[in-house]
Amino acid sequence: MTTMTSPATLPPGPTAPRAVQGAYALTQPLRGMRRLKDRYGDAFTVNVPIFGNAVVISSPAEIKQLFTSGPELVDNLEVNLGRVLGPRSMFALSGDEHKRQRKLLVPPFHGRRLAAYEKIVEEETARELASWPENRAFATLPSMMRITLNAILRAVFGAEGAEFAELRELLPPFVTLGSRLAVLPISKKGRFSPWRRFERMRREYDAIVDRLIAKARAEEKDDVLSMMLQTRYDDGSGLSREEISDQLLTLLTAGHETTATTLAWAVERLRRHPALLAELEEGDGKLLDATILEVQRTRPVIDLTARQVKQDGFRLGRWTLPKGYAVLVSIALIHDDDTVFPHAATFDPHRFEGARPDLYQWIPFGGGTRRCIGAAFATMEMTVVLRTLLRDFTLVPTSEPGERWHSRGVAYAPAKGGRAVVRRRTTIGGAS
């Protein structure tokens, strides 16, 4: 029996060799995407390192179709992020295995447990903000990195200890290197390959986690690691050591850098919108929620979410894609689309007041069955940090041009680190 498949019908795109397209993508990532959309429309075909042959889409209808298609049609795109975080990471798993793991990992980051983590975030924010200088410019991104790293470490491992301190020192350079390796086609071969250094750091991380697992088995605690050790699959089996180690690394990296970067962008945006800043200083919680949504829309720190076609003749809107092709959803392109978000270039949080965003249009956390499991935790973190910052400090507005986008590997950060000038409203103890 012969299975008939529809012939491929692909959107137009550049015809330059892969190396040339790759160089363009690396040197002009966001601007290049916009130019390609202007030339070819809201879907175009590219051939670039890491992804290979790929169709880039930014139409809400096609994005919705992609996100709601089953894993037999489109599933995980196995790129470097899985190599960086490990073969048992959520980023490396597909199909039923991904579904099984996701079911176990979602509960620690929702519901009543989220409320318990809020106190941790507030404590870490107050601790970091106590050292902020007044009346002189400084980059806020390093502070936001420390807040989010310490908060996720405490949520995952509980109380501080020797291992906590070791991870706090190891993870920042580990995450920075891994983030760059995830987007660069660098071979693992060779004495001087940066993968050698990364693998050495990974062994250090695994040794620390092994000690933490041994301690957690001997103690009754209420942190994420303890929950992972207690949780069971439907067949009664538990998570393996490798699964725990890879998933913890995923939580620690994904739950730290991207949130911190969004917070730095929030500071950068607020200082350039004094009228909005004045409204927020009155303590309007709903406007703060809308502001966080708008920061994520206008300054998404991750530009792409991806799938791979698993079946020949996959119909995606107007197109028919062959098996093996990647489908790349450009978050920046749909967020910048005036037909989706009127006056998209304008930073206006009021567009989200009293309205929940459409999750096939506003997609900073990705979408579908692979949407970030830590989205609720990240949103809570951003809310607590900004609420505390605006309560305890006056952010001094600026007329300087907006900071440029700077690639840190996976994430796009403000080029100057989200510079701020602040004045303290209260003393450390909270007295006027």
What are these regions (language model features)?
Residues 2-10, 74-82, 97, 113-261:
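Cytochrome P450 heme-thiolate monooxygenase catalytic core
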Residues 22-41, 284-317, 338:
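Conserved cytochrome P450 K-helix E-x-x-R motif and the immediately C-terminal K′/meander segment
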